Amino acid sequence: MINSYPLTENDLVATQKVAEAFGHQFGDNASLAPSPASASEDFSIFGRTWGVPCVFWFVGGTDPAVYAKAKQDKTVNKIPSNHSPKFAPRIHPTLETGLQAMLTAASAWLCPRTTA
């Protein structure tokens, strides 16, 4: 049983590679520079255990109008997140964006862009 998780730290080189790929895919809508966030994620164990670089990112799924109002009211931290029973992302386009993000990140290694 695991009662605690180590800090999740993105690998710098891998993060730069994923950020570049996200920039090509999503343009100005992509950002891998969120504010630090504390969370209990088992994700941080994978890279350490397997000795591989890891990159953890978030995919926003809140209705843009709800987010804009929360930002205006300075209550963004009260928007329910993924472990809350009140979590209610907009399924579309959230699911499509999440899939595109995963495929884009994987493709950065599996199908790297080449320059002539």
Locations of the language-model features?
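Metal-dependent amide/peptide-bond hydrolase catalytic core
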Residues: 1-116
